[in-house]
Amino acid sequence: MTFKTLDDLTDIAGKRVLVRVDLNVPVKDGQVTDTTRIERVAPTIRELSEKGAKIILLAHFGRPKGEPVADMSLKAIAPAVEEILDQRVHFAADCIGDKAANAIAEMNDGDVLLLENTRFHKGEEKNDPAFVTALAANGDLYVNDAFSAAHRAHASTEGLAQHLPAYAGRTMQAELEALEKGLGNPKRPVVAIVGGAKVSTKIDLLQNLVKKVDALVIGGGMANTFLAAQGVDVGKSLCEHDLAETAKSIIAAAAAAGCAIVLPEDGVVAREFKAGADNAVVDIKAIPADAMVLDVGPKSVAAINDWISRAETLVWNGPLGAFEIAPFDKATVAAAKHAAARTRQGSLVSVAGGGDTVAALNHAEVADDFTYVSTAGGAFLEWMEGKPLPGVDILHKQK
């Protein structure tokens, strides 16, 4: 895996550097409620600023469908960026044209300028050549630090890298290096944990993983679909009965590839989904007809932790149970803590990603102990599915 990084950028004082960042952060009542994505790109911005570059930030926010929408303006995000950088962040009311050009002309070396939402122009999502040219006119160099948007072939994520010398920012670099360790060229055995509610959203992912990992642990609601396909009565549990044949084909593909499929042996069942609901641990073949499985049971956790103990590499996407509500978080927390402990010992490379997964690891208070936790969502999932990522592929081509 070869691409240029900030290490390849020298003598950039006074140069205009267009930096694609991810500022698509949650906002409530005009305030940013989670600054994780801003914190992730801060090191790249600081490093470029210290080298004397003029840093021009490009980002999208929401889905404005190619025209200005007042409450999707990036102006509201600028104060949060300022606070994290501890540096003044200037703002331009457009990302191309005179408003952008005039703001850039007033920049001093080391300054940071945030341009308006790229998606206020239809050309962004269409990767329109004229729009790409207009964006490229604002810079001398291009840095992509938004892996989370790398699965989109948009003007600011892919088009610009064809017009300007292109480099990976520090977050992009860290993400790509972690993913290479996770699935690209991993230490074996490799174990994947895939959970979450539905098989239907993760068919491509499961079909790709069985070819690449030594064991695939299936948890969450999606495990019920696999169990039902094997003739287990899952009661009132969340289950996609119409995907029984898909589940069987994934099991067959795993067998052909020598990948062990690990399904729950026992489950925590309840008759209602609420905090503190009456619950019981039952054998997976003894689920009451009027109950639903909301977590995997202790026997299953022991088996999962045994696989984690044998693994050199762990890739995790999706919780094992309905972790948002106690006590149905126990399995996810136990497996996460075990993986974190082995990672701290230096015995395991652990890579995790996806919104629910990040929330679950934070809930277990172990996110910082994993080798890498991706905040990228869709891009992380598409990488796990083995799909090309245009924003990454173009960086490789430039090298």
UniProtKB/Swiss-Prot annotation:
E.C. numbers: 2.7.2.3
Entry protein name: Phosphoglycerate kinase
Superkingdom field: Bacteria
Keyword Kinase: yes
Keyword Cytoplasm listed: yes
Pathway: Carbohydrate degradation; glycolysis; pyruvate from D-glyceraldehyde 3-phosphate: step 2/5
Any one Gene Ontology cellular component term annotated for this protein: cytosol
Signal peptide segment: none
Family of the protein in this entry: Belongs to the phosphoglycerate kinase family.
GO biological process, one term: glycolytic process
Subunit architecture: Monomer.
Pfam families: PGK
Species of origin: Sinorhizobium fredii (strain NBRC 101917 / NGR234)
Residues where substrate binds: D22, L23, N24, R37, H60, F61, G62, R63, R119, R152
Keywords, ordered alphabetically: ATP-binding, Cytoplasm, Glycolysis, Kinase, Nucleotide-binding, Transferase
PROSITE patterns the UniProt entry points to: PGLYCERATE_KINASE
Binding site for ATP: K202, E324, G354, G355, D356, T357
GO molecular function: ADP binding; ATP binding; phosphoglycerate kinase activity
Membrane-crossing segments per the record: none
InterPro entries named among the record's database cross-references: Phosphoglycerate_kinase, Phosphoglycerate_kinase_CS, Phosphoglycerate_kinase_N, Phosphoglycerate_kinase_sf
Principal EC category: transferase
